[in-house]
Swiss-Prot record:
Binding-site residues, ATP: 44, 74-80, 101
Gene Ontology MF term list: ATP binding; ATP-dependent diacylglycerol kinase activity; metal ion binding
Active site, per annotation: 281
Binding site for Mg(2+): 220, 223, 225
Keyword Transcription regulation tagged: no
E.C. number: 2.7.1.-
Keyword annotations of the record: ATP-binding, Kinase, Lipid biosynthesis, Lipid metabolism, Magnesium, Metal-binding, Nucleotide-binding, Phospholipid biosynthesis, Phospholipid metabolism, Transferase
InterPro entries reported for this sequence: ATP-NAD_kinase_N, Diacylglycerol/lipid_kinase, Diacylglycerol_kinase_cat_dom, Lipid_Phosphate_FormReg, NAD/diacylglycerol_kinase_sf, YegS/DAGK_C
Cellular component aspect of the GO annotation: plasma membrane
Protein name: Putative lipid kinase SaurJH9_0749
Species for this entry: Staphylococcus aureus (strain JH9)
Cofactor(s) the protein requires to work: Mg(2+)
NCBIfam families: YegS/Rv2252/BmrU family lipid kinase
Pfam families cross-referenced by the UniProt entry: DAGK_cat, YegS_C
């Protein structure tokens, strides 16, 4: 087989979510080495290491011939690589190999949830171009959320049960599971303003959150637009069939309790200040400015058969 790439770098973290990370590395390198003449395996020991390595790759201090990046890990590890690539303007394709609890964006890329199968898919995967979310000075592939979604993430981090489980964030009758915190918000989306009281606001780039698909048929991470959802009712027992697919044109007509607003530039303030979940990482508080950066990143994508 002809090598597609000259020098690939595989990033991984010891706490990737795999039970045996060293075994996992061995399982994925068989396929990856078949498409790269040279494959470097790079451990990320501390948070921020991957961003530092991206800077070294940009300045050619890491190596002069790197032409593809791979990441084995969960959404948090992937998020760090996205931030490294975006902040250092690395115009390199990325292959994502699932290795954590949730890999929401790999579903969008049609990548198998098993890391070994995913590595084999990289052999024939094609490069696709995707939008990225910019939040203040950080970047994300998939979503930005606050309110109930943060409460859930903190539950999971504390080792408590994930109340959403495999249910959609937009489908759970969460009032019976958790007492959501109400907060006041002021939201500007493409110069239109919205305000009120809510328990959750979610801005999505990708169609999968928490392992399930948002039932909005035209939501795409390749359309140069973000989709913001405001949960207006305290109890989200909102639909005859929450999983019934709908598009942007009729969402607000048939979906009670969740307002959908598409847009490109978003400013959000809250009272009180609220923690913000960015692709599963809680690292900011409101106020925040959000914008879409179209066609910003190259990701290996498996053709949907």
């Amino acid at each position: 087989m002809e090598n597609k790439y000259t020098h690939g770098v595989l990033f991984y973290h010891e706490h990737s979510g795999l039970k045996n990370i060293n075994q996992g590395i061995g399982e994925v390198t068989t396929a990856l080495s078949s498409i790269c003449k040279h494959l470097s395996i790079q451990l990320s020991e501390n948070e921020g290491d991957i961003i530092k390595y991206c800077q070294e790759i940009k300045t050619k201090n890491y190596a002069k011939d790197v032409d593809i990046l791979f990441i084995l890990g969960g959404d948090g590890t992937v998020n760090e690589l996205i931030n490294g690539v975006m902040s250092h303007d690395l115009q390199l394709p990325i292959g994502i190999l699932p290795g954590g609890t949730f890999n929401d964006f790999t579903k969008t890329l049609n990548i198998a949830p098993n890391h070994k199968q995913a590595s084999e898919q990289m052999i024939s995967a094609q490069v696709g171009t995707y939008d990225v979310i910019k939040i203040n000075n950080q970047y994300a592939l998939n979503f930005v959320g606050l309110g109930l979604i943060v409460q859930n993430a903190e539950n999971v981090q504390d080792g408590s049960k994930d109340i959403f489980g495999k249910l959609s964030y937009i489908g759970s009758t969460v009032k019976t599971l958790l007492n959501p915190t109400q907060f006041n918000y002021q939201l500007s989306i493409d110069d239109k303003t919205y305000s009120g009281e809510t328990t959750m606001i979610l801005t999505a780039n990708g169609p999968f959150i928490g392992g399930s698909r948002i039932p909005l048929t035209d939501l795409s991470p390749q359309d140069g637009e973000l989709n913001t959802f405001i949960f207006n009712e305290q109890s989200f027992s909102i639909l005859n069939d929450i999983f019934k697919k709908r598009d942007s044109m009729n969402w607000n007509e048939i979906t009670q309790g969740i307002e959908h607003i598409p847009g490109k530039k978003i400013s959000l303030t809250t009272d009180p200040a609220m923690k913000v979940d960015i692709d599963g990482e809680i690292s900011l508080e409101t106020p925040i400015d959000i914008e879409v950066i179209p066609n910003a990143i190259q990701l290996l994508t498996v053709n949907d058969l």
